[in-house]
Amino acid sequence: MSVDFIVATPHDALEFNDVYRNTTGSAGYLACNNIYNRVVLNEWYEINPFPDLATHWECLDGARRWRFHLNKAARWQDGTPLTAHDVAYTHSHAKEMGYTGAMFLQDVDHIEEVDRHTVDYHLSRPNSGFLVLLGNFIFAHILPAHLYEGTDWSTNPHNLKPVGSGPFRLVDWTPGEHVIMEAVPDHWGPQPAIDRLILKIVPDRDECVRIVARGEAHIVPQDTLTRDRLHLVPEDSEAEIMTRQGPGMALLDFNHRQERWKDERARRAIAHAVDRSEIDRLGDPGVSQAWDHYLLGSSEWAFNPEAKAPAHDVEAAERLLDEAGLTKDANGSRGDIRLYYMDMFFGHKPLAEIVARQLEAVGFAVTYDGLSSPDWASIVRRGGEFDLIIVGGSMAPDPEITATKYSSAGRNNMAGHANADVDAAYEAAREATTLAERGAHYRRLQEVWARDTEWVPLFWYGMYYPRSKHFFGWADQIGFSIPWWHWGRMRRI
C-alpha cells in the first residue's frame, strides 16, 4: 500500500533553487530540503554537525582550511555520480555571482578539488564556526554542475525541473494546488519509508491547521499554527501539538545608513520607548516571551545575562530624542517612520502594531506593512528603503550564523551595521578553538550590542507544530540529525 506524507502550507513555490535565490518558507524552500543535499547538516538545537554528502571532515591549518570527504556512493537523480566538482562549482559560482548561497561563504578564499571525492575549503582567515555555516541553511545545498555549469542560473530550466541528490524527486508542480515528490528508488543514502511527499497549497492558515487536525495532512510549516490558533487542534484530533522555545528572536533594527540613527542616543531612545510588558502578552510561558537580552538564554555556552536592552522609560526616550536633534515640530511630530516586517512570519504583525503605537507615543508618525519574501528582498535587503524593520531569524546553535546580518562585511547586512567592536568580537570568536573561548568572545559581542544599542531585542518566539500521531521520524525524535523540514526519515506507525 502506497504511503503519502502530506504537508499543508500556505505559500506556493516560485522555483526550486534556493542557492540562487532564497524564498523563505515557500513550498519551493520546503521541497529543496528533500530534493537536495548539503555538505554537512546542522539543526537549530544541535551545535555538532552530522554527515550528509560528506561522511567525515577535518579542521586544518588552525581552522583556515576545512577538508570534506564525500560519500562515494552519492548520485544525482539522473544517475550521474556526485563529485567534488559539484561541491566546488556550486559554492564557488554562488560566491562569484553574489547569489543567496554565498551568504555564509564570506570567509572562503577558494575551494580546491583535492581528488574526485575530497574537497578543501580554503578560508581567508580562521573560522572555527565554519561547519555551522555549511550545515544550517537550505541555500547551502549542492547543485549538479553538469546541468548548471556554463548556464545563466536565473533562466536555467532545472530551477523548475530540479535534479537533486536527495531522497525525493519532483514529479509534479501544479501552481496554487500542490508540489508532489516521490521517493527515489534505490537512493544512495537512507531510503525513505514513504512513497510520496506532497506539499498541499492551502492559503488560509486556519484551514492548514484544521486539515492536519482532521488527519488529511500531517504537518504544517513554521508560523502556521500560532498561539491564537491552538483551539483548532482539539485533544481528540488526529494530531499532537509539539511546542518548543524557538531558535531565534524577533528584533527591531535600524537603517544604520540614515543620519538620524547614526546617533546612538536616537537608537537608545527608541529602545527606551519599547514597553515589553505589552509585548509579553503575546507570550506563552515556557514557549515564548518578551525578551530584552541580545542572545537566547538557551545558548548557555555563549549567553551574557548582563547584556540587556534599555528598560522602558518614556521620559528618557523623549530627552534622548531631543538631545539627538529629533525634536518635535509645531504639530508635535518628530518625523515619519516606515516600519516593515516579513508577512510570512505571522507573529511579527502584532509586534509591529505594538511598536508603532509605542513610537507614536513619543512623537513619530509610523506606518507599518508586511512584505512578501520577494518584496522584502527587493525593498529591504537590496533597496534599503526602510527606516525600521522587525526581523527574525535563527541565532542558534552558534552565534556565528548572525554575522552575515550584523557584521560590517556581512552579505545579508541589510541594515548597514558598521561597528568595529562588533567585527572584532566576531573575528576573535572565529579564531578561538575551544567552545569556552568562543563563548567568552560572544559574551563580549552581546556587551557591545547592548552598549551601542545596535538593535533592540523584542521577543523570543516559540514554535508550535500540529503533527500527525501516525508518523515517526520528526527531527526532534532522531536527535536533530536532519533538517527540520526534511521528511526522508518519516515512517508510518
Regions found by a protein language model. Name each.
Residues H69, M103-Y148, D172:
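Surface-exposed binding/hinge segments that line
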Residues A8-D61, S92, V163-S165:
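N-terminal lobe/hinge region of extracytoplasmic solute-binding protein
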Residues N71, E182-P185, R244-A269, A273, ...:
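A bilobed periplasmic-binding-protein/Venus flytrap-type ligand-binding module shared by bacterial periplasmic
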Residues S26, L30, L41-Y45, N136-P192, ...:
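Gly/Pro-rich hinge or "lid" segments in bacterial periplasmic/extracellular proteins
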Residues I111-E113, V171-E182, I198-Q258, R281, ...:
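Extracellular/periplasmic solute-recognition and catalytic clefts
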Residues V7-H11, L30-A31, T174-H178, A183, ...:
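Detector for C-terminal structural segments
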Residues T55-T100, V114, D120, I211, ...:
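Aromatic- and charge-enriched surface segment that lines or borders ligand/interaction sites
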Residues W261, A290-A324, D343-P350:
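Structural transition elements
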